[in-house]
Amino acid sequence: MKCIDELSAGELKGKRVLVRSDFNVPMGADGEVADIFRLKRGWETIQYLSKQGARVIVASHIGRAPEESIEPVARALKKLGAIIYIPDIVGPAAKGAVAAMQDGDIVLLQNLRRDPREKKNDESFARELASLADIYVNDAFAVAHREDASIVGVPKLLPSYAGFLMRDEVAQLTEALHPPRPSLAIVGGAKFETKDPIIRSFLEVYDHVCVVGAIANDCLKGKGFPVGRSRVSEHAPAREVCENPHLIIPTDVTAERSDKQAFVKKPQDILPDDKIVDIGPDTVATLAPYIAEAKFVTWNGPTGIFEEGYISYTSAIAELIAKRVEKGGLHCVIGGGDTISALKESGIPEEKLGFFSTGGGAMLEFLLKGNLPGISALG
């Protein structure tokens, strides 16, 4: 995989460069971008190309509904630098705007998924996108596990490179595939069936794996503890997973009654009316020595239902990691949109925790397979 900075300024000046970014960002109630984390991470590549004199054509999808407009993203990006929004993808307006570009200009195309051919990896759509540019750059790690036209189709048609975000993600997560020892993985999530493969993989590679979030309920239930009305998966964890000596499950939990009052309890004390919403202080204390000794931590998934305000124990673990990182000798890779959102609410700066991955599903798939379709497509 070649990175775009392997080309000289002379090789980029005047060239039309199609940058596949991932600007699928959350929107607030006012219809504007609520979190610019991904925008700031993706802007580095775009700004670099612009300064090299390239004509930068940025493409991304947003949301799940194909009719959703990417215009709010354009407004947010304008706070980072000069950008022209084109409400078109490969039609006359897009072609005309690209033809009128000057060296250093940046344009943002409309939501790629407005064209149904994008998700179908349609060859004709890939050709139309490729016709806009001379060079292709994939900087969209978070969707590199998708086989969409802009991810795997266009690279077949143009000289293709990784952007800086993609390069950094691959480097960081490659280290997480074979972490220095001692190592710790913290894995959360809502559905055990989606996390089962990565937990099994981590149990073979990491010294200890701690399960948190709703998937911890599945492990508690698998070990015979009551879980009340807590969320559990249809796919129950296998006995060999629950009883693996390297697996850490919560030693206490925060349980919410139907009247919304929450209490810290031991797992065996959960009542039928209780809903587990987070871990507890004893679990944090259990993790503390593992974090203190670790040289590498991978973390994907908050400890509790953060959207309902249960972030105190996510924050407590983050504080332990931040202190250990500051002391030196620990590197931490953190991923998953919910994890990062919860950590931002904790107020601990990103640089004090380690590397924040933009990928959720892509991060886990890379850690499971060591590659992704969008990375393979870059050659």
Q: Language-model segments: which ranges?
A:
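Active-site loop-to-helix "anion-binding N-cap" substructures in soluble metabolic enzymes
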Residues: M1-G379
